[in-house]
UniProtKB/Swiss-Prot annotation:
Its EC number is 3.4.21.-. The lineage of its organism: Eukaryota, Metazoa, Chordata, Craniata, Vertebrata. One of its GO terms (molecular function) is toxin activity. GO terms for cellular component: extracellular region; secretory granule. This is Thrombin-like enzyme catroxobin-1. Disulfide bonds join C26-C42. The active site is at H41, S60.
Amino acid sequence: VVGGDECNINEHRSLVAIFVSTEFDCGGDLINVEWVLTAAHCTLCAGIPEGGLDTCGGDSGGPLICDGKPDGITS
């Protein structure tokens, strides 16, 4: 933000902080009760440790499966 003003946290109740474990990762805006809008650089790059299979580039998105269960959506 360039030229912004400080504000009280209670003035903008739709802002969210996204944490990975206990580390702040990114911010976003709550656009309804289930969805957060965030910047493209805040997206998840899911894959296998060995490499070669991932959603990091050239993928059109789809379900994110963790431990055999649906856990989200990649884009």
